[in-house]
């Protein structure tokens, strides 16, 4: 038995994984390559569309989609801009209207995905949007802005509904608990981080009716100021057009 262990160890140590591609392959390797592009050979070319901002094929693209940390040389687009890492998760508002002229060079996504739309400014300020359900932007509730409760994510929070943080009801991922989940961050189930030094949960502070009314009054005042600024801008624009209209009479005679 000892001889078998020694021979197996010697065989593993003497194996060159770079020459034997099947040495580090697992049963889930094809899934990772197809879904996330992990493990692609270095001789596979980098996707040109992805390097310019966005690839419509996504994970199904046969070429490599390197992350910014893996890129050794700074690739730039024709406009002189590097592929965006901050706007690449937001949908282009001009594309939704059919008015984007950048095409594949646009720093934003060209797809119909409401979950990746920017946040609605009107709803975020006042909790009300005049477009309602027809609005193309995200309506983020105040409760959704709270950070998740670490104690609840690990199974139990002693404060329950009185906790000042958000309690997200998700079942634990059985694959993550077993050691590895092939879905990674895209997994719909919870991947809790176990820690012994979690902060103690705090009580949620309920606002009084006077405080809520004061906030509503401030929001109404801000909306009125915005409407006033818009009216002034339109009136200035109208006066400018009227001022220039009719001034030019052409070249005079003689």
Curated annotation (Swiss-Prot):
Top-level taxon of origin: Eukaryota
Compositionally biased tracts (Basic and acidic residues): 203-239
Compositional bias ranges of the Low complexity kind: 68-84
Sorted UniProt keywords: Metal-binding, mRNA processing, Nucleus, Repeat, RNA-binding, Zinc, Zinc-finger
Subcellular location: Nucleus
Keyword Iron: no
C3H1-type ZnF: 41-68, 91-113, 114-142, 143-167, 168-194
GO molecular function, one term: zinc ion binding
Pfam families: zf-CCCH
GO cellular component, one term: mRNA cleavage and polyadenylation specificity factor complex
Chief place of localization: nucleus
Region (Disordered): 65-84, 198-254
SUPFAM superfamilies referenced in this protein's UniProt entry, alphabetically: CCCH zinc finger
GO BP: any one term: mRNA processing
UniProt family annotation: Belongs to the CPSF4/YTH1 family.
Function: Component of the cleavage factor I (CF I) involved in pre-mRNA 3'-end processing.
The protein, known as: mRNA 3'-end-processing protein yth1
């Amino acid at each position: 038995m000892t001889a078998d262990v020694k021979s197996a160890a010697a065989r593993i140590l003497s194996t060159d994984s770079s020459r034997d591609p099947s040495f580090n392959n697992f049963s889930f390797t094809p899934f990772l390559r197809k879904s996330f592009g992990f493990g692609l050979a270095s001789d596979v070319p980098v996707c040109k569309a992805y390097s310019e901002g966005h690839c419509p094929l996504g994970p199904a693209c046969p070429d490599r989609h390197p992350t910014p940390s893996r890129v050794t040389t700074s690739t730039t687009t024709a406009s002189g801009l590097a592929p965006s890492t901050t706007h690449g998760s937001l949908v282009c508002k001009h594309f939704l209207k059919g008015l984007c002229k950048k095409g594949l060079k646009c720093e934003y996504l060209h797809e119909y995905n409401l979950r990746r739309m920017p946040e609605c400014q009107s709803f975020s300020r006042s909790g009300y949007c005049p477009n309602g359900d027809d609005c193309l932007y995200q309506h983020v509730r105040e409760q959704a802005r709270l950070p998740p409760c670490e104690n609840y994510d690990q199974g139990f929070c002693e404060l329950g509904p009185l906790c000042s943080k958000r309690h997200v009801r998700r079942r634990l991922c059985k694959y993550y608990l077993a050691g590895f989940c092939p879905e990674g961050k895209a997994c719909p189930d919870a991947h809790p981080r176990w820690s012994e030094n979690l902060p103690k949960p705090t009580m949620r502070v309920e606002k009084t009716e006077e405080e809520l009314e004061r906030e509503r009054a401030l929001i109404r005042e801000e909306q009125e100021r915005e409407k006033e600024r818009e009216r002034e801008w339109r009136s200035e624009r109208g006066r400018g057009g009227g001022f220039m209209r009719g001034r030019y009479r052409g070249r005079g005679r003689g």
